[in-house]
Amino acid sequence: MTSLKKIYSGKVRDLYEIDDQRMLMIATDRLSAFDVILDDPIPAKGQILTAISNFWFDKLKDVVPNHLTGDQPEDVVAAADLPQVEGRAVVAKRLKAVPIEAVVRGYLAGSGWKEYRQSGSVCGIALPAGLKEADKLPEPIFTPSTKAAVGDHDENISFAQCEAIVGAELAAKVRDTAILLYQTAAEYAATRGIIICDTKFEFGLDENGTLTLMDEALTPDSSRFWPADSYQPGSNPPSFDKQFVRDWLEASGWNKQAPAPAVPLDVREKTAAKYREALEKLAG
């Protein structure tokens, strides 16, 4: 990218400065697993993520405003940079980030299931006894985590810790908005044969202090999507996401420290196909 200055490089997205109110966000084909960025890209992943996020930003715009400005990426870069933005970039508002990851869980899986088995609760929220892996929770729960730097692990925190970080009023607003976003999206996804097990939202505040959804929305990177037709509580359903790569890495004996081993092309292509299937199912 020659026409704009890079201001940040995340696990998946690169940010470039347009002016003091707007930035260009490019979704790359990078994949991170276990908080390590893999060397091998997933074909067309950035385009698929961008299409899924844009679909949800539009669908959920009545629940909460989002970071999109409505400007076209093609209008803010030089002609030579057009191939880098095609289908994978958005022009976004520059917001003051809320420094927590807003995780909502509707089902018991992943780190939530691990924690429940140890303590009967998740992030300090007590749950009924006797739940099985992948069980639907009585109601969706807000289980925030800290926002870690690239390469560090996000840490689950209690709601009280969340209040200590951002203040009681904003913490409650983030929680209520995140749960409403999850419920609205999960209801729609169910009509498309997809269960949204859990998801992670990121929020910012605009110049007026308005809570705004940013970064990405309900993608296979930020969410666990399960096919409804093969859902069976008591086992971990196959998901439309990077589980293929994670399973391959687990089986490889890798110690989860950088650098990660090279992931075979067929595993990466299967992962890309899963991402594409999620887009097709959701957006039809």
Curated annotation (Swiss-Prot):
Annotated SUPFAM superfamilies: SAICAR synthase-like
Task: Return the NCBIfam families for the record.
Answer: PRK13961.1, purC
Q: Which UniProt keywords apply?
A: ATP-binding, Ligase, Nucleotide-binding, Purine biosynthesis
Mind telling me which InterPro entries this protein's record contains? SAICAR_synt/ADE2_N (IPR028923), SAICAR_synth (IPR001636), SAICAR_synthetase_CS (IPR018236)
Copy the pathway line from the protein's UniProt record.
Purine metabolism; IMP biosynthesis via de novo pathway; 5-amino-1-(5-phospho-D-ribosyl)imidazole-4-carboxamide from 5-amino-1-(5-phospho-D-ribosyl)imidazole-4-carboxylate: step 1/2
Q: What is its EC number?
A: 6.3.2.6
> What family is this?
Belongs to the SAICAR synthetase family.
Task: Supply the gene name.
Answer: purC
Q: Name one GO cellular component term.
A: cytoplasm
Q: What is catalysed by this protein?
A: 5-amino-1-(5-phospho-D-ribosyl)imidazole-4-carboxylate + L-aspartate + ATP = (2S)-2-[5-amino-1-(5-phospho-beta-D-ribosyl)imidazole-4-carboxamido]succinate + ADP + phosphate + 2 H(+)
- Transmembrane among keywords: no
This protein is called Phosphoribosylaminoimidazole-succinocarboxamide synthase
Q: Tell me, what is an example of a GO biological process annotation in this record? A: 'de novo' IMP biosynthetic process
Check the record and name the Pfam families matching this protein: SAICAR_synt
Looking up HAMAP family in the UniProt record yields: SAICAR_synth (MF_00137)
Tell me if Ligase is a UniProt keyword of this record. yes
Q: Which CDD domains match?
A: SAICAR_synt_Sc (cd01414)
* Species classification: Bacteria, Pseudomonadati, Pseudomonadota, Betaproteobacteria, Neisseriales
GO MF annotations for this entry?
Answer: ATP binding; phosphoribosylaminoimidazolesuccinocarboxamide synthase activity
